[in-house]
């Protein structure tokens, strides 16, 4: 057994070089007095190291800045860093206040933001040629997710899917064919092949029975209201069949758990919330107005929203969004 530069810090996400002689990994400092359900906007900066697999000798090649992005923020992926065929490391980083992808050379030079903008990356995978990176994000469609592609040489990512659906978990085969899981407001998730023009072909068309009531499911409205401290809160509003704005209806407010979650304008990528979306549709079918609230401390809207001041055990500031949701419904 060869230990890679052992220390008192936490070493995670190892990935081999293409020549199998080196290993890159993330090193996160140990910090005391870190409690759950409290905002953590900065900490001791994390870093990326590369070790010689024979000797175990390692070298730090990159380190996060102090302040914004100093606390490691993960993405949904098999591994948190990717070693590409052109000898770059691609990794998630919140330097700009959003979960983005960056690249550096394995020498530690030429840090580059691959996904610029006010949005967040979530599901990430690498192509089998070890060059291209596929990912889902809410760029230009903040309450949905679509699929994009980038690599260490691109200035801006290419958008591969769009529309009123939600796409995630991209994966490519050795021939470059791209596959995803996808849903919409009236179809639950199932697998698709992504065509070159961005359209989707179902790989399991019989997975959803003909009896599924897709024609009566409602397209939720995107609602944004302002809560305390001028924080914008995104919501999905489900209205009853044949809704009449001159009539009164019973109303329900849905709050997700977590709280690191973002409810979407379609069936969700997590099983529990996939079912919760269906439940909200059912309640609307029973004559209720349903408001699903993405309260502060959730994901999708940047680090400052996720690490909301005084949230959770440090003051429950997110409860102000509960009050604001009730006031919104009362004002309709």
PLM region spans:
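Serine-hydrolase catalytic core recognition
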Residues: 130, 159-162, 166-332
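Residue-level recognition of a conserved intra-blade site in WD40 beta-propeller repeats
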Residues: 16, 82-84, 126, 172
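Hydrophobic beta-strand positions that form the internal "hydrophobic ladder"
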Residues: 20-23, 88-90, 132-133, 178-179
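A flexible loop/linker signature enriched in serine peptidases of the S9 family
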Residues: 1, 5-12, 26-53, 60-76, ...
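Sequence/structural signature of beta-propeller blade repeats across diverse families
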Residues: 65-69, 109-112, 155-158, 207-210
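Short loop/turn segments that connect beta-strands within beta-propeller blades
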Residues: 53-56, 105-109, 151-155, 195-198
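Signature of short aromatic-glycine-proline-rich micro-motifs recurring in repeat-based ectodomains
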Residues: 74-87
């Amino acid at each position: 057994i060869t230990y890679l530069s052992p220390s008192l810090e936490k070493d995670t996400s190892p990935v081999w070089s293409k020549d199998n002689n080196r290993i890159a990994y993330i090193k996160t400092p140990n910090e005391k007095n870190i409690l759950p359900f409290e905002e953590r906007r900065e900490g001791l900066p994390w870093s990326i190291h590369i070790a010689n697999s024979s000797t175990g000798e390692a070298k730090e090649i990159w380190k996060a800045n102090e302040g914004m992005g100093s606390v490691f923020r993960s993405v949904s992926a098999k591994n948190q860093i990717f070693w590409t065929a052109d000898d770059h490391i691609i990794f998630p980083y919140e330097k700009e206040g959003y979960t983005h992808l960056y690249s550096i050379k394995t020498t530690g030079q030429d840090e580059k933001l691959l996904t610029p903008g006010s949005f967040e990356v979530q599901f990430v995978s690498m192509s089998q040629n070890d060059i291209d990176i596929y990912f889902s994000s809410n760029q230009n469609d903040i309450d949905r997710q679509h699929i994009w592609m980038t690599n260490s040489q691109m200035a801006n990512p290419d958008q591969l899917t769009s529309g009123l659906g939600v796409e995630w978990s991209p994966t490519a085969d050795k021939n470059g064919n791209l596959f995803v899981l996808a849903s919409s407001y009236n179809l639950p998730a199932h697998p698709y092949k992504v065509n070159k023009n961005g359209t989707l072909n179902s790989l399991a068309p019989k997975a959803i029975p003909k009896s599924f009531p897709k024609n009566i499911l409602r397209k939720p409205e995107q609602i944004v209201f302002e809560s305390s401290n001028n924080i914008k809160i995104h919501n999905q509003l489900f209205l009853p069949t044949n809704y009449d704005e001159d009539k009164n209806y019973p109303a329900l407010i849905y709050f997700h758990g977590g709280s690191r979650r973002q409810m979407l304008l379609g069936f969700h990528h997590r099983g529990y919330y996939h079912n919760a979306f269906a439940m909200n549709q059912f309640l609307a079918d029973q004559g209720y107005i349903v408001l699903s609230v993405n309260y502060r401390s959730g994901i999708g809207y940047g680090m400052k929203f996720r690490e909301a001041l005084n949230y959770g055990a440090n003051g429950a500031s997110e409860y102000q969004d509960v009050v604001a949701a009730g006031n919104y419904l009362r004002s309709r």
